[in-house]
Each structure stands twice: as C-alpha cells, then as structure tokens.
C-alpha cells in the first residue's frame, strides 16, 4: 500500500517511499521511449502519402493536357496516317521491283552459268541450274524486262525459248548417255544419268528409260532361259523362280533410288511396269510348260480313269487281276509335274506378297495411306487385279493342278489298298495302308499349303482331300473293322467263350483298330506341322481366314476315326476284357473276411493284405494290351478302370459283409487296389472317384444318419441319396448285430 511522504513517521518509510518513486519514474521513462519509437514510422508514412498526393495532382494535369492535344489534332492524325500508308506502298513497290530485278538477274546468271557448265560438260551442274531456272515464275521469264535484259550474243533467243532449248538438249544428251551406259551395263553411269532426268523436268521420260532398260533385261534373261532344252524335272519351275527373283531383286535394289529422286507415287508406277514385264514373261514360261509337259493331255487322260480296283476294295469284292484297269498316267511321271506346277504357284504368290507389302509401304510414305491397322491386315495390291499371270493361274494352271493332284492322291490310295499288308510280328499291329496313305496325305496337304494360294488350298482340301479320305480311306477301314466286330460278336454269341474265337479274327480286329487310331494321330500331326506357320505363309488377312477354316474342316476327320475306335471298343471290351476283369476281382476277394475284431484288424494291417497281393500278381496279365497302340491301350485301360470301380462298388453294397473294423480294412485294401488298377496314372484315377466317396462313407462316424445331411457334411458329389441310404442302412444293421 502506497504511503504519502507527509505521513511517514520514520526513516525506513521515507526510504521505501523514495525507492517506489524511482521505480515508477523508470517505468514512465520506458513508456515514453516506446511512444516516441512508434511515432517515427507514422511520420514517415504521412510523408509518403503527401508525396504521392502531389504526384497524383501532377499526373491528372498531364492527362488533361494530353486530352486537349488529341482533341485538337484529329484532322492532322488522319493526314499523317494517309501519308504513312502512301510511303508504305511506295516502299513495297520498290521492294517488289528490286525482287523482280533480282529474279531476272538470277535467271540470267543461271542461263550464263548453264552455258558455261554445258561447255565444260558439267552435266550435274547443268541439270541443277536448269532446275533452279525452271523454278522461276513464268510471268517473270516471259515479262518485257526479262526479254530486254536476258538475251545475250551467246543466247539471243527469248528467255523461255533459251531455257526450253537447253532443256531439250540436255534431255537428248541424258537419254543417249543413259542408253549407252545401259548397253555397256555400266551401273554407275546408269545411276548417274537416271538421277538427272527429274532435275530438268523429265521425270516421265527418265522412268520410261529406266523401265525399258530393265524390262529388256528381264525379257532377254527369260528368253535365254527358255532357249535351253528342259534338262530336268523342275526346269520350268526353276525358270519361273529365276524370273520372279530377278524382278524382285531389281525392285528391291532400285526402289530407294527411284523413291529418292522420283517420289513414291512414281516408284509405284515403275513397280507396276516391271510387274507387267514379269507377267508377260511368266505367262510365256507357263504356256511353254503346258506344251512341253503335255499337261492338257494328262488332264484328259486321267478324266477317264474309273478306279475299278478301289471300288472293288471298298465293296469287299474279289478282284481278278486280268480285269485290272490300265493306268492312264503313272504316279512316278505325275509327281515331278505336280512339284513343278506347285512351285510356280508358290513363287508367284510369294512375289505378290512382296510387291503388296512394298506398295503399301510406299503408299504410307507418300501420305496416301497412313492407317496403322492396314499393315496388320495386308491386302493384295491393285496391280494384280489386271495381271495376265494371275488370270492364267486362275483359268488354266490351278484347275489343271487341282485335277492332277486329286488323281494323284486317289490313285495313291488305290495302290495302297492293292498292296496292303498286315504287320503283326512287331507291336503295335497295324496295316501297311496307314503309313502309305498318311504319307501321301501329308505330301499333298503340305504341297497345297505351300503353294501360298488360298484359292487352291481351300478347293483341294474341301473338294478333294476330305471327301477322298472320308469316302475311300475311312469307309474302307470302318467297313473292314465293323465287319470283323460283327463276326467276333456273332461267334461269341454262338460259342459263349471268347477263347474259342479264332485268333485270326482277333488279329484282324487289333490291326484295324490300331490303324484307325494311328490315322487319327497322323492327321493331327499333319495339321500341327502347318498351323504354326499359317500367318507366316499366308500374309493376306483374308487368305488366313479361308485357310484356317479349311484346316479346321480337315481336322474334323479325326472325330470320325475316334468314334470308330470307340464303337469297336464297345464290342471288344465286354467280350474279351470284362469277364477277365470280373473274374480277377472275384478271385482276389475270394475268402477275404471283413468282419474283424480290433485284434484281427491290428494283426491284418501289419503286412500287405492277401487281396492286394493276389491282384498285383495277375492284373497286368489280365490287361495284356501290348499289341495295341499306346493310345488304344490307354482307352482300354480307362474302360477297365471304370468297370473295375463299378464292379467293386457292387461288391461293397451287396456281397461283401463288413463291420466297423472290417470297413477300415476294406478301405485300406481298395485304396491299394486303385493304385494297382491305375498304375499311378492320374488320368486313370478319376474313374475311382465315386468308389472313393463310398469308402469315405464306410469309415465315417456321425451321429446323423440322414442321407442329405451326410452328403452335405462330406461334400459327396457323385453319390445319390439312394446309395447313401443303402450304405447307412447296412452300417446300422451291422452295428445292431454287434
């Protein structure tokens, strides 16, 4: 509490009051200092505002002066603008005049330099100068000023006439030198003068000279080849191959040069002309081949062939050797001709693909086709729409090839049937016709495929190959096999004993069913051999679809052979295998007790059970299938496993008596038997899935006996409610007896 100085009573109070006054004085001084320091920025800010106000007043005054000046000088501004425009026009005229004079001067200098270049025989420089001079506007060259200043004593004609005269002179010179280099086969000089034609505005003439030169080379080489006598079987195929490869090499080597100096559009024109030469020479080669090989006569000869032996074999009639039909054309004669014709078709179609890709690339580089999806869906170039060679192939070569190939294939099958033998000394047993027919099938299929002609391939496969295989080869095999099956079935029904059936009939059956199985495998391997190369061989998207469809149709033949095997197995299995399988299982379970005590169960499980030992020793002998093909063995083993599983199910449900411990022993025994039956092959174990569900149910302990509940609890997929009910009822009866 503060005390007034007048109220102090002693010295200590006076000292305290003095101290308080000093503290208060110090606080007051600090407060004054803060106020002074805050006042300085405020003064500075006020000074700045005052300065800005003075400048703003000055700025407003200047704006008023400018406003008055603009308002009073409107007419003067329009006059100034008009004068400026006038000066600009005069300046532009002067620039145009200077440019005009400069262009005329440059044109005159070009002509003078051109005259000197020609005098010194500097043809590249001369051509370049002509190109520069020709780039000048015709209005300038034909103007009065140019007519007045350009002519000289050395070049007195009008400027345009002088340029035309020099151009024609150079054109004549280049044409002469180009043909001279062509006669001398001087590739360097040919290229030199070929590049100069576009510079003097003679692109068309340059391309014409190029085409005539190389067209002459193509024709002369083709004629030289045909002038030689045909010394070997593939003479005309070799001649045609040489022709298309020669044309392709010319196009491949010179396309970059032509494209560089003549542009892509003109390059396509050159390719069309060279392809036209290839057409003409190729047609000559094909027509000559038809004459020399007498192909039309061959086609006429085979048309009257009746296939008497083949029909007799198909109808299983005896054939008298004296009635053997005279062979019109030998297969040895026909085979090289087919190779020759196919090679020509192949080379032509490969050439079409090459040209089409090149034309597409040139079109894209020229900007006429820039769709990126076009390259993935290549189509044939329009060049071939009017091709003579293409027409000759469609009208003459391919129809003849189709008839000859069809005869070759069917006659080969007829010969195979005539020479048929059964091979039963080595396993698997089979007929000789399988190797013979499938070898020829692969040969003609691949020959048709590699013609690279979707038209020929689809027609041959769909109209000849498939019908002949189905109506001749398949019918022959199926008729013989089903006949043997019916004979065996009839004998079994009469004798009631499979062992009494003649061994010859069984031998015929195994041989024929193996032949059907091998035929299916061969057909698949033939298709696999070409399917991976479909897109590589047939580049056109449309062709790929047609060929793929024909291959799929061909592959459907395998279904016929597969069904034939299944049908024959349905006869063979119940007669020869099923009784042995059932007897084997009965013998294995004979005398085996499954009503066991705990002690009996423990003792029995210490070693392999007798039922397992018995089956292990006889199962391989029961399925003695070594004469069958591996695929047929697998099919029969699969059928055996299915029947074994079904038979054991029946034993469990209706014959074998078991209790709880016996069910456990039974489950162990059958699990071991399944391993023996399936030979540890996973694809055979699936036949026992239903049996394994029954085993699970046998050893399952549950308070619930409702079948539906058990099916849900154990996730039983294959057992019906009736089967589950029967098993649970049998378990209940066993437990009741216990």
UniProtKB/Swiss-Prot annotation:
InterPro entries (UniProt xref): COG4, COG4_C, COG4_M, COG4_N
Membrane topology: Peripheral membrane protein
Keywords recorded for this protein, A-Z: Golgi apparatus, Membrane, Protein transport, Transport
Coiled coil location: none
GO process annotations (BP): intracellular protein transport; retrograde transport, vesicle recycling within Golgi
Annotated localization: Golgi apparatus membrane
A cellular component term, taken from the record's GO annotations: nucleus
Residue intervals passing through the bilayer: none
Entry superkingdom: Eukaryota
Pfam families: COG4_C, COG4_m, COG4_N
Family membership noted in the UniProt record: Belongs to the COG4 family.
Assembly and oligomerization: Component of the conserved oligomeric Golgi complex.
Known function: Component of the peripheral membrane COG complex that is involved in intra-Golgi protein trafficking. COG is located at the cis-Golgi, and regulates tethering of retrograde intra-Golgi vesicles and possibly a number of other membrane trafficking events.
Name the record gives this protein: Conserved oligomeric Golgi complex subunit 4
Organism listed in the record: Schizosaccharomyces pombe (strain 972 / ATCC 24843)
UniProt lineage: Eukaryota, Fungi, Dikarya, Ascomycota, Taphrinomycotina
């Amino acid at each position: 509490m503060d005390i007034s100085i007048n109220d102090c009573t002693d010295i200590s109070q006076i000292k305290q009051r003095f101290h308080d006054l000093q503290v208060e004085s110090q606080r007051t001084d600090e407060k004054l200092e803060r106020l002074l320091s805050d006042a300085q920025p405020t003064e500075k800010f006020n000074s700045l505002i005052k300065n800005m106000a003075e400048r703003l007043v000055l700025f407003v005054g200047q704006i008023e002066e400018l406003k008055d000046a603009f308002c009073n000088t409107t007419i003067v501004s329009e006059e100034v603008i008009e004068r400026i425009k006038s000066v600009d026009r005069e300046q532009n005229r002067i620039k145009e005049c200077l440019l005009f004079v400069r262009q005329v001067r440059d044109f005159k200098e070009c002509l003078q330099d051109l005259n000197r270049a020609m005098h010194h025989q500097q043809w590249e420089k001369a051509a370049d100068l002509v190109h520069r001079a020709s780039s000048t506007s015709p209005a300038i060259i034909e103007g009065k000023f140019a007519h007045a200043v350009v002519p000289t004593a050395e070049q007195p004609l009008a400027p345009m006439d002088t340029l035309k005269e020099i151009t024609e002179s150079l054109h004549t010179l280049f044409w002469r030198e180009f043909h001279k280099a062509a006669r001398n086969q001087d590739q360097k000089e040919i290229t030199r003068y070929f590049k100069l034609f576009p510079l003097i505005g003679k692109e068309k003439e340059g391309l014409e000279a190029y085409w005539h030169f190389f067209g002459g080379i193509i024709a002369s080489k083709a004629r030289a080849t045909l002038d030689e006598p045909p010394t070997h079987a593939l003479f005309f195929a070799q001649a045609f191959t040489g022709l298309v490869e020669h044309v392709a090499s010319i196009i491949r080597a010179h396309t970059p040069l032509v494209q560089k100096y003549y542009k892509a559009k003109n390059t396509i024109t050159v390719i069309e002309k060279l392809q036209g030469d290839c057409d003409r020479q190729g047609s000559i080669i094909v027509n000559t081949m038809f004459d020399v090989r007498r192909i039309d006569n061959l086609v006429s000869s085979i048309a009257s062939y009746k296939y008497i032996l083949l029909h007799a074999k198909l109808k299983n009639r005896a054939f008298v050797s004296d009635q053997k039909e005279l062979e019109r054309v030998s297969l040895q004669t026909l085979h090289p001709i087919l190779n020759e014709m196919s090679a020509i078709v192949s080379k032509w179609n490969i050439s079409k693909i090459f040209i089409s890709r090149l034309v597409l690339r040139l079109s894209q580089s020229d900007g006429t086709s820039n769709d990126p999806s076009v390259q993935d869906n290549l189509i044939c170039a329009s060049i071939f729409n009017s091709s003579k060679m293409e027409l000759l192939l469609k009208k003459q070569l391919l129809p003849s090839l189709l008839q000859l190939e069809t005869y070759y294939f069917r006659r080969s099958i007829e010969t195979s049937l005539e020479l048929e033998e059964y091979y039963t000394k080595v396993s698997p047993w089979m007929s000789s016709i399988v190797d013979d027919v499938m070898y020829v099938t692969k040969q003609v299929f691949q020959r048709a495929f590699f013609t690279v002609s979707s038209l020929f391939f689809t027609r041959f496969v769909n109209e000849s190959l498939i019908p002949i295989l189905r109506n001749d080869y398949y019918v022959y095999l199926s008729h013989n096999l089903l006949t043997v099956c019916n004979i065996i079935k009839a004998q079994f029904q009469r004798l009631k004993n499979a062992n009494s059936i003649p061994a010859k009939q069984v031998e015929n059956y195994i041989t024929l069913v193996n032949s059907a199985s091998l035929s299916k495998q061969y057909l698949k391997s033939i298709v696999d051999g070409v399917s991976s190369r479909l897109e590589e061989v047939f580049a056109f998207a449309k062709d790929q679809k047609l060929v793929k469809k024909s291959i799929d149709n061909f592959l459907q033949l395998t279904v016929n052979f597969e069904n034939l095997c299944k049908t024959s197995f349905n006869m063979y299995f119940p007669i020869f295998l099923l009784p042995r399988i059932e007897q084997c299982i009965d013998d294995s379970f004979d005398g085996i007790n499954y009503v066991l005590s705990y002690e009996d169960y423990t003792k029995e499980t210490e070693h392999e059970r007798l039922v397992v030992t018995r089956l292990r020793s006889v199962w391989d002998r029961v399925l003695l299938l070594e004469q069958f093909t591996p695929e047929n063995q697998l099919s029969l083993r699969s059928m055996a496993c299915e029947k074994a599983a079904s038979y054991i199910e029946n034993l469990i449900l209706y014959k074998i008596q078991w209790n709880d411990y016996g069910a456990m022993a039974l489950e162990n025994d059958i699990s071991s038997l399944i391993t023996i039956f399936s030979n540890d092959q996973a694809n055979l174990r699936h036949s026992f899935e239903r049996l394994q569900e029954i085993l699970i149910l046998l050893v399952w302990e549950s308070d619930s006996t409702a079948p539906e509940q058990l099916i849900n609890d154990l996730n039983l997929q294959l057992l019906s409610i009736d089967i589950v009910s029967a098993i649970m009822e049998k378990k209940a009866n066993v437990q009741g007896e216990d």
